[in-house]
Regions:
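Short, well-structured alpha-helical segments in soluble
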Residues: 1-9, 31
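Amphipathic alpha-helical protein-protein interaction segments
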Residues: 3, 15-18, 96-103
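Active-site lining segments that contact anionic ligands and/or coordinate catalytic metals
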Residues: 10-11, 36-39, 54-60, 142, ...
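Hydrophobic alpha-helical
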Residues: 11-32, 106-109, 116
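Extracellular/periplasmic periplasmic-binding protein-like sensory domains
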Residues: 29-107, 114-128
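Segments of small-molecule ligand-sensing domains
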Residues: 82-191
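Extracellular/luminal ectodomains of metazoan preproproteins built from arrays
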Residues: 185-204
Length: 204
């Protein structure tokens, strides 16, 4: 597939596959020597912080969106407990941490819905769970958790844009840097151009 992309002279590549396939595509970008100046890569998913060097080289300079977790005592405590459980420090800019925080709140959302159903002496079934989820509103570790009216989208969930900037000083962990965000009140995308590293960067 990437061979066809190379032959076609395509330089702006959007990857919308799940993480495992995204990793394979970045490996293919590396294999075909496509990570070089003049190219731009965008993906729907962040790669893990401990991917192979070939994948990191192939994905250097790519952009990926992720939830922006607001600072709070709950988030700090969650990080502390998670670090104690894993017996290692946690990078709050990693996809693993962000996904963990969101997943925790997803489980709590279902728990809140079930509790509300029981408090109202209703039957716990699929229909009622969905009905009550649409009315949930609680302070989670990823921020205030509620759904936008008439949709399944999280209300007021800030989004940031990460840029893969190679490895951190340890030479083993991918260095994802937040270079922009979408303002929740206006939908405006704010980008810090000076913080971006592009594909083919010579200082990798």
């Amino acid at each position: 597939y990437m061979g066809d992309v190379k032959d076609a002279g395509i330089k702006h590549i959007f990857i919308t596959t799940p993480t495992p396939d995204t990793v394979r595509l970045f490996q293919s970008l590396y294999d075909h020597g496509l990570n070089k100046p003049g190219f731009t890569f965008y993906a729907a998913e962040m790669i893990l912080s401990d991917e192979s060097p070939e994948v990191v080289y192939g994905s250097l300079g790519y952009f990926a969106p992720a939830a922006m977790l607001p600072s709070s005592e709950k988030l700090t405590l969650f990080k502390k407990v998670l670090e104690a459980r894993l017996n290692k420090s946690i990078d709050t800019a990693s996809s693993t941490f962000i996904t963990s925080a969101l997943s925790y709140d997803h489980i709590m959302a279902v728990a809140h819905a079930i509790r509300s159903i029981k408090n109202d002496s209703q039957i716990v079934n699929r229909e009622n769970v969905m009905k009550y989820l649409r009315h949930m509103d609680f302070a989670g570790i990823s921020g205030q958790v509620s759904l936008s009216p008439g949709s399944n989208d999280r209300a007021g969930m800030a989004v940031q844009i990460f840029n893969n900037q190679g490895y951190k000083a340890d030479g083993k962990t991918v260095n994802f840097v937040s270079i922009g965000f979408v303002k929740t009140d206006t939908g405006t995308l704010i980008i810090n151009d000076d913080a971006i590293i592009w594909p083919g960067a010579s200082n990798f």
